[in-house]
Structure formats: structure tokens, C-alpha cells
Amino acid sequence: MAEKFIKHTGLVVPLDAANVDTDAIIPKQFLQKVTRTGFGAHLFNDWRFLDEKGQQPNPDFVLNFPQYQGASILLARENFGCGSSREHAPWALTDYGFKVVIAPSFADIFYGNSFNNQLLPVKLSDAEVDELFALVKANPGIHFDVDLEAQEVKAGEKTYRFTIDAFRRHCMMNGLDSIGLTLQHDDAIAAYEAKQPAFMR
């Protein structure tokens, strides 16, 4: 089973860029592995580092700013996760330490992949995201409270409502990925298989 997500309080980092694609999130040269770990080191590699080997941090990239070290909530702009389909993108984000991405919109495939990997994509309106960017930039180091059960983000003195469909919310709150969902029906699967002719087993 995956880790349950019910509530999360975390440091927020503002990535003020629209149409951040999956190749920017995790460049293609790092996709050889099929395990989910180790990708965080290469998250936003071409933006975070000045060299190809990832040894010289770019001091002008927001994830490298001292006040945002340890951030677990990413604040982004519209169409986050667009581009080619690669599940490595949410792998890289979660391996780096992100639990939540807040944006006005997400690419459809990235949105679905995020739930499969216990990364919560929160959609808020453009105006609400503008407010949050202003709040974070005025208060570096601010933390947000994200409550999946209540479907709320508490930021400063305001509360922002978001909506996640009931099935995805149930899965995240119970730590159920595709394997976990299947195992919930293990007895029924075993009973079905037992009824099959021997040559089909």
C-alpha cells in the first residue's frame, strides 16, 4: 500500500512559470531507470543546475534559494505537467519531497499520474493562484495547510476550497494505488480463479 494522504502542512515554493512540461520536470536523459527512486536528484535538472552533470547549482533558480529548502508544496501556473507522457515526472517530484502541487490547471495525463503516485494536484482558479503567489512572495518561508478530507487549503488568513473526485480522494486517503485496489478484491479474485477449468489456471 502507498502512504495515506489526509492532511499535509508544508513549506511552499513558488515556481512562477506556465506550461511547465514533463521534459523540464525530468529531462529525458534521466529516464532509463524503471524504479521510482532517485529521480529527485534530477528534478528540473536543466533549471536547477548550470552544468550537465548537476554539480553546479543555479543560484537564480527558485528551488535553490535558501528560504525554500525542504519545500513540500509546489505553487505553479497553468497547464503544469504538459508535454510527453512520462510517469517519471511525478516520481521526480515525490522523490524530491513534494506532496502537493497547486496550479490553475494540469495536463490530463500528468494529473492522473499524480494520484497514482500519492502526489496531490490541487486546482484553484487563476485569481486564487495569483493571490497565493503574492502571499508567498511577500512571506518567504510560509507554510500552507492542505486538508484532502475537507478539500481545503489554508494559507495565511484565508481558506481556499478545491474539489477532488470521490474515487481519487478515497484512494489517496487510504493509500491505495492500483495494486492496493486489486488486493482489496483478493478473495473474489481467488474465488473466480478457483471456478475456472484446470487448463485455464
From Swiss-Prot:
It catalyses: (2R,3S)-3-isopropylmalate = (2S)-2-isopropylmalate. Pathway: Amino-acid biosynthesis; L-leucine biosynthesis; L-leucine from 3-methyl-2-oxobutanoate: step 2/4. Keywords: Amino-acid biosynthesis, Branched-chain amino acid biosynthesis, Leucine biosynthesis, Lyase. Its EC number is 4.2.1.33. Pfam families: Aconitase_C. One of its GO terms (biological process) is L-leucine biosynthetic process. It is an enzyme of class 4 (lyase). One of its GO terms (cellular component) is 3-isopropylmalate dehydratase complex. GO terms for molecular function: 3-isopropylmalate dehydratase activity. Catalyzes the isomerization between 2-isopropylmalate and 3-isopropylmalate, via the formation of 2-isopropylmaleate. HAMAP family: LeuD_type1. PANTHER family: 3-ISOPROPYLMALATE DEHYDRATASE SMALL SUBUNIT (PTHR43345:SF5), 3-ISOPROPYLMALATE DEHYDRATASE SMALL SUBUNIT 2-RELATED-RELATED (PTHR43345). Heterodimer of LeuC and LeuD. NCBIfam families: leuD, PRK01641.1. Belongs to the LeuD family. LeuD type 1 subfamily. This is 3-isopropylmalate dehydratase small subunit.
